UniProtKB/Swiss-Prot annotation:
Signal peptide boundaries: 1-20
Keywords attached to this entry: Disulfide bond, Glycoprotein, Pyrrolidone carboxylic acid, Secreted, Signal
Disulfide bridges in this chain: C123-C186, C225-C280
Residues that carry a glycan: N109, N112, N128, N259
Subcellular location, principal: secreted
Protein name per UniProt: Zinc-alpha-2-glycoprotein
PANTHER family according to UniProt: MHC CLASS I-RELATED, ZINC-ALPHA-2-GLYCOPROTEIN
Lineage, top ranks: Eukaryota, Metazoa, Chordata, Craniata, Vertebrata
Residue ranges occupied by any Ig-like C1-type domain in the UniProt entry: 207-292
Record GO terms (molecular function): protein transmembrane transporter activity; RNA nuclease activity
PTM sites of type Pyrrolidone carboxylic acid: Q21
Length: 298
Protein backbone atom coordinates (compact mmCIF):
# COMPACT_ATOMS: atom_id res chain seq x y z
CA UNK A 1 0.00 0.00 0.00
CA UNK A 2 2.78 2.42 0.93
CA UNK A 3 4.45 2.04 -2.42
CA UNK A 4 1.15 2.71 -4.17
CA UNK A 5 0.65 6.14 -2.63
CA UNK A 6 3.03 8.09 -4.88
CA UNK A 7 1.37 6.43 -7.87
CA UNK A 8 -2.02 7.71 -6.72
CA UNK A 9 -0.73 11.22 -6.19
CA UNK A 10 1.00 11.21 -9.56
CA UNK A 11 -2.27 10.19 -11.19
CA UNK A 12 -4.08 12.99 -9.41
CA UNK A 13 -1.53 15.42 -10.79
CA UNK A 14 -2.24 14.22 -14.31
CA UNK A 15 -6.00 14.00 -14.07
CA UNK A 16 -8.24 17.02 -14.34
CA UNK A 17 -11.11 17.94 -12.01
CA UNK A 18 -14.62 19.07 -12.86
CA UNK A 19 -15.67 22.72 -13.16
CA UNK A 20 -19.04 24.33 -12.30
CA UNK A 21 -20.69 26.83 -14.61
CA UNK A 22 -19.33 30.37 -14.69
CA UNK A 23 -21.57 32.86 -13.01
CA UNK A 24 -21.50 36.61 -13.31
CA UNK A 25 -18.55 37.01 -10.95
CA UNK A 26 -16.33 34.66 -13.01
CA UNK A 27 -16.34 31.65 -10.68
CA UNK A 28 -15.72 28.10 -11.86
CA UNK A 29 -15.07 24.88 -9.99
CA UNK A 30 -13.86 21.37 -10.70
CA UNK A 31 -15.02 18.63 -8.33
CA UNK A 32 -14.44 14.89 -8.20
CA UNK A 33 -16.48 12.59 -5.99
CA UNK A 34 -15.40 8.98 -5.40
CA UNK A 35 -17.53 6.35 -3.68
CA UNK A 36 -16.45 2.86 -2.59
CA UNK A 37 -18.57 0.09 -1.04
CA UNK A 38 -17.11 -2.57 1.27
CA UNK A 39 -19.78 -5.16 0.41
CA UNK A 40 -21.42 -6.17 -2.83
CA UNK A 41 -24.74 -4.51 -3.62
CA UNK A 42 -26.68 -5.91 -6.55
CA UNK A 43 -26.52 -3.73 -9.67
CA UNK A 44 -24.34 -1.14 -7.88
CA UNK A 45 -20.62 -0.93 -8.79
CA UNK A 46 -18.24 -1.25 -5.85
CA UNK A 47 -16.45 1.92 -6.97
CA UNK A 48 -17.82 4.98 -8.76
CA UNK A 49 -16.24 8.26 -9.80
CA UNK A 50 -18.06 11.39 -10.92
CA UNK A 51 -16.62 14.66 -12.15
CA UNK A 52 -18.45 18.00 -12.19
CA UNK A 53 -17.74 21.36 -13.71
CA UNK A 54 -19.62 23.82 -11.52
CA UNK A 55 -22.99 22.14 -10.99
CA UNK A 56 -22.95 19.88 -14.08
CA UNK A 57 -21.57 16.35 -14.19
CA UNK A 58 -19.27 15.93 -17.16
CA UNK A 59 -17.79 12.45 -16.72
CA UNK A 60 -18.29 9.14 -14.92
CA UNK A 61 -16.37 5.93 -14.29
CA UNK A 62 -17.19 2.78 -12.36
CA UNK A 63 -15.61 -0.55 -11.46
CA UNK A 64 -18.06 -2.49 -13.63
CA UNK A 65 -17.44 -0.85 -17.01
CA UNK A 66 -13.97 0.51 -16.23
CA UNK A 67 -14.43 3.22 -18.85
CA UNK A 68 -14.29 6.96 -18.34
CA UNK A 69 -17.25 8.37 -20.24
CA UNK A 70 -18.32 11.97 -20.87
CA UNK A 71 -21.80 12.85 -19.67
CA UNK A 72 -24.59 15.17 -20.75
CA UNK A 73 -23.63 17.98 -23.09
CA UNK A 74 -19.98 16.88 -22.95
CA UNK A 75 -20.81 13.88 -25.13
CA UNK A 76 -20.64 16.29 -28.06
CA UNK A 77 -17.37 17.92 -26.94
CA UNK A 78 -14.26 16.65 -28.71
CA UNK A 79 -10.65 17.03 -27.67
CA UNK A 80 -11.16 18.02 -24.04
CA UNK A 81 -9.87 14.73 -22.63
CA UNK A 82 -8.34 11.46 -23.82
CA UNK A 83 -11.02 9.23 -22.29
CA UNK A 84 -9.18 5.99 -23.05
CA UNK A 85 -6.11 7.20 -21.19
CA UNK A 86 -8.29 8.61 -18.43
CA UNK A 87 -9.86 5.17 -17.97
CA UNK A 88 -6.43 3.77 -17.12
CA UNK A 89 -5.81 6.54 -14.63
CA UNK A 90 -9.19 6.02 -12.98
CA UNK A 91 -8.53 2.28 -12.69
CA UNK A 92 -5.31 2.97 -10.79
CA UNK A 93 -7.10 5.46 -8.53
CA UNK A 94 -9.85 2.91 -7.95
CA UNK A 95 -7.25 0.39 -6.74
CA UNK A 96 -5.80 2.85 -4.22
CA UNK A 97 -9.21 4.00 -3.04
CA UNK A 98 -10.54 0.49 -2.46
CA UNK A 99 -7.31 -0.54 -0.74
CA UNK A 100 -7.81 2.35 1.69
CA UNK A 101 -11.37 1.21 2.37
CA UNK A 102 -10.09 -2.31 3.00
CA UNK A 103 -7.55 -0.96 5.50
CA UNK A 104 -10.28 0.85 7.43
CA UNK A 105 -12.57 -2.19 7.58
CA UNK A 106 -9.67 -4.36 8.77
CA UNK A 107 -8.73 -1.80 11.41
CA UNK A 108 -12.22 -2.01 12.90
CA UNK A 109 -12.38 -5.79 12.35
CA UNK A 110 -15.80 -5.46 10.73
CA UNK A 111 -15.58 -7.30 7.43
CA UNK A 112 -19.20 -8.46 7.77
CA UNK A 113 -20.57 -4.93 7.91
CA UNK A 114 -21.56 -2.68 5.02
CA UNK A 115 -19.43 0.46 4.86
CA UNK A 116 -18.93 3.39 2.50
CA UNK A 117 -15.83 5.47 1.82
CA UNK A 118 -16.27 8.72 -0.07
CA UNK A 119 -13.73 11.21 -1.32
CA UNK A 120 -14.28 14.74 -2.57
CA UNK A 121 -11.52 16.85 -4.06
CA UNK A 122 -11.06 19.65 -6.53
CA UNK A 123 -10.45 23.35 -6.94
CA UNK A 124 -11.99 26.71 -7.79
CA UNK A 125 -10.93 29.73 -9.79
CA UNK A 126 -12.38 33.22 -9.81
CA UNK A 127 -11.56 35.75 -12.52
CA UNK A 128 -8.96 33.26 -13.81
CA UNK A 129 -7.13 33.13 -10.47
CA UNK A 130 -7.04 30.18 -8.09
CA UNK A 131 -9.48 30.87 -5.25
CA UNK A 132 -9.77 27.61 -3.34
CA UNK A 133 -9.11 23.87 -3.18
CA UNK A 134 -10.34 20.89 -1.18
CA UNK A 135 -9.46 17.23 -0.64
CA UNK A 136 -11.37 15.27 1.99
CA UNK A 137 -12.53 11.73 2.72
CA UNK A 138 -15.57 10.47 4.62
CA UNK A 139 -16.19 7.05 6.16
CA UNK A 140 -19.82 6.04 6.68
CA UNK A 141 -20.79 9.69 6.30
CA UNK A 142 -18.37 10.99 8.95
CA UNK A 143 -15.18 13.00 8.48
CA UNK A 144 -12.23 10.64 7.99
CA UNK A 145 -9.16 12.55 6.77
CA UNK A 146 -8.49 15.86 5.02
CA UNK A 147 -5.49 17.41 3.32
CA UNK A 148 -4.49 20.82 4.66
CA UNK A 149 -2.28 22.45 2.05
CA UNK A 150 -1.23 25.26 4.37
CA UNK A 151 0.59 22.96 6.83
CA UNK A 152 0.92 20.90 4.52
CA UNK A 153 -0.27 17.57 5.96
CA UNK A 154 -3.09 15.06 6.12
CA UNK A 155 -5.31 15.79 9.12
CA UNK A 156 -7.02 12.67 10.57
CA UNK A 157 -10.49 12.74 12.14
CA UNK A 158 -10.79 9.03 12.86
CA UNK A 159 -8.53 6.55 14.71
CA UNK A 160 -8.10 4.46 11.56
CA UNK A 161 -7.08 7.61 9.68
CA UNK A 162 -3.85 7.70 11.68
CA UNK A 163 -2.72 4.66 9.70
CA UNK A 164 -3.79 6.28 6.43
CA UNK A 165 -1.88 9.42 7.38
CA UNK A 166 1.28 7.41 8.08
CA UNK A 167 1.10 5.73 4.69
CA UNK A 168 0.29 8.90 2.78
CA UNK A 169 3.10 10.80 4.49
CA UNK A 170 5.68 7.99 4.41
CA UNK A 171 7.89 10.19 2.21
CA UNK A 172 7.98 14.02 2.20
CA UNK A 173 7.50 14.01 -1.58
CA UNK A 174 4.02 12.49 -1.16
CA UNK A 175 2.83 15.54 0.75
CA UNK A 176 4.47 17.96 -1.67
CA UNK A 177 2.76 16.25 -4.60
CA UNK A 178 -0.63 16.53 -2.93
CA UNK A 179 -0.02 20.23 -2.27
CA UNK A 180 1.13 20.77 -5.86
CA UNK A 181 -1.97 19.05 -7.17
CA UNK A 182 -4.33 21.37 -5.31
CA UNK A 183 -2.39 24.56 -5.96
CA UNK A 184 -1.09 24.02 -9.49
CA UNK A 185 -2.30 20.96 -11.38
CA UNK A 186 -5.99 21.15 -10.53
CA UNK A 187 -6.40 24.85 -11.47
CA UNK A 188 -4.45 24.20 -14.68
CA UNK A 189 -6.75 21.33 -15.57
CA UNK A 190 -9.79 23.44 -14.81
CA UNK A 191 -8.55 26.17 -17.15
CA UNK A 192 -7.93 23.55 -19.83
CA UNK A 193 -11.45 22.18 -19.48
CA UNK A 194 -12.93 25.67 -19.59
CA UNK A 195 -11.54 26.14 -23.09
CA UNK A 196 -13.98 23.45 -24.17
CA UNK A 197 -16.78 24.11 -21.69
CA UNK A 198 -17.41 27.83 -21.22
CA UNK A 199 -20.13 27.85 -23.87
CA UNK A 200 -21.92 25.18 -21.82
CA UNK A 201 -21.31 26.69 -18.40
CA UNK A 202 -21.98 30.33 -19.34
CA UNK A 203 -25.16 29.79 -21.32
CA UNK A 204 -28.52 31.28 -20.28
CA UNK A 205 -31.50 29.03 -21.03
CA UNK A 206 -34.83 30.75 -20.21
CA UNK A 207 -37.49 28.76 -18.36
CA UNK A 208 -40.66 27.41 -19.89
CA UNK A 209 -43.63 27.80 -17.55
CA UNK A 210 -46.85 25.81 -17.20
CA UNK A 211 -49.71 26.59 -14.81
CA UNK A 212 -52.19 23.83 -13.85
CA UNK A 213 -54.94 23.32 -11.27
CA UNK A 214 -56.36 20.35 -9.40
CA UNK A 215 -59.14 19.99 -6.86
CA UNK A 216 -59.94 16.85 -4.90
CA UNK A 217 -63.49 16.43 -3.51
CA UNK A 218 -63.96 18.48 -0.34
CA UNK A 219 -60.56 20.16 -0.57
CA UNK A 220 -59.20 23.52 -1.66
CA UNK A 221 -58.17 24.00 -5.26
CA UNK A 222 -54.42 23.57 -5.77
CA UNK A 223 -52.60 25.75 -8.28
CA UNK A 224 -49.25 24.48 -9.50
CA UNK A 225 -46.65 26.49 -11.40
CA UNK A 226 -43.91 24.46 -13.07
CA UNK A 227 -40.77 26.10 -14.48
CA UNK A 228 -38.52 23.83 -16.52
CA UNK A 229 -35.67 23.65 -19.04
CA UNK A 230 -33.81 26.61 -17.48
CA UNK A 231 -30.11 27.15 -16.81
CA UNK A 232 -28.36 28.14 -14.60
CA UNK A 233 -30.19 26.62 -11.67
CA UNK A 234 -30.83 29.70 -9.55
CA UNK A 235 -34.47 30.74 -9.93
CA UNK A 236 -37.36 32.32 -8.03
CA UNK A 237 -40.87 30.95 -8.60
CA UNK A 238 -43.81 32.26 -6.56
CA UNK A 239 -47.55 32.91 -6.70
CA UNK A 240 -49.32 36.22 -6.18
CA UNK A 241 -52.97 36.88 -5.31
CA UNK A 242 -54.20 40.25 -6.51
CA UNK A 243 -50.56 41.34 -6.67
CA UNK A 244 -49.56 40.10 -3.20
CA UNK A 245 -47.02 37.29 -2.78
CA UNK A 246 -48.58 34.11 -1.37
CA UNK A 247 -47.03 31.61 1.02
CA UNK A 248 -46.72 28.31 -0.87
CA UNK A 249 -48.34 25.15 0.39
CA UNK A 250 -45.64 23.08 -1.30
CA UNK A 251 -42.39 23.94 -3.04
CA UNK A 252 -40.26 21.60 -5.11
CA UNK A 253 -36.49 21.60 -5.02
CA UNK A 254 -34.52 22.81 -8.02
CA UNK A 255 -33.71 19.53 -9.76
CA UNK A 256 -31.65 18.44 -12.75
CA UNK A 257 -33.68 17.42 -15.80
CA UNK A 258 -30.93 15.14 -17.08
CA UNK A 259 -30.33 17.27 -20.19
CA UNK A 260 -28.20 19.97 -18.59
CA UNK A 261 -31.17 22.08 -17.46
CA UNK A 262 -33.30 22.36 -14.32
CA UNK A 263 -36.88 22.34 -13.15
CA UNK A 264 -38.76 23.60 -10.09
CA UNK A 265 -42.37 24.11 -9.03
CA UNK A 266 -44.55 25.75 -6.39
CA UNK A 267 -48.14 25.06 -5.24
CA UNK A 268 -50.67 27.33 -3.50
CA UNK A 269 -54.12 26.47 -2.13
CA UNK A 270 -57.16 28.54 -3.17
CA UNK A 271 -60.31 28.64 -0.97
CA UNK A 272 -63.53 27.58 -2.77
CA UNK A 273 -65.11 31.06 -2.88
CA UNK A 274 -61.91 32.94 -3.73
CA UNK A 275 -62.28 34.73 -7.08
CA UNK A 276 -59.21 36.97 -6.83
CA UNK A 277 -56.70 36.82 -9.71
CA UNK A 278 -53.70 34.50 -9.19
CA UNK A 279 -50.49 34.68 -11.20
CA UNK A 280 -47.22 32.77 -11.23
CA UNK A 281 -44.08 34.94 -11.25
CA UNK A 282 -40.73 33.58 -12.44
CA UNK A 283 -37.42 35.41 -12.09
CA UNK A 284 -34.30 34.05 -13.77
CA UNK A 285 -31.00 35.50 -14.97
CA UNK A 286 -31.94 34.71 -18.59
CA UNK A 287 -35.00 36.99 -18.41
CA UNK A 288 -34.82 40.75 -18.86
CA UNK A 289 -37.87 41.04 -16.62
CA UNK A 290 -39.95 38.60 -14.55
CA UNK A 291 -42.19 36.24 -16.47
CA UNK A 292 -45.81 36.45 -15.28
CA UNK A 293 -48.29 33.69 -16.14
CA UNK A 294 -51.87 34.25 -14.92
CA UNK A 295 -54.10 31.39 -13.87
CA UNK A 296 -57.23 31.41 -15.95
CA UNK A 297 -60.11 30.06 -13.84
CA UNK A 298 -62.40 27.75 -15.77
Amino acid sequence: MVRMVPVLLSLLLLLGPAVPQENQDGRYSLTYIYTGLSKHVEDVPAFQALGSLNDLQFFRYNSKDRKSQPMGLWRQVEGMEDWKQDSQLQKAREDIFMETLKDIVEYYNDSNGSHVLQGRFGCEIENNRSSGAFWKYYYDGKDYIEFNKEIPAWVPFDPAAQITKQKWEAEPVYVQRAKAYLEEECPATLRKYLKYSKNILDRQDPPSVVVTSHQAPGEKKKLKCLAYDFYPGKIDVHWTRAGEVQEPELRGDVLHNGNGTYQSWVVVAVPPQDTAPYSCHVQHSSLAQPLVVPWEAS
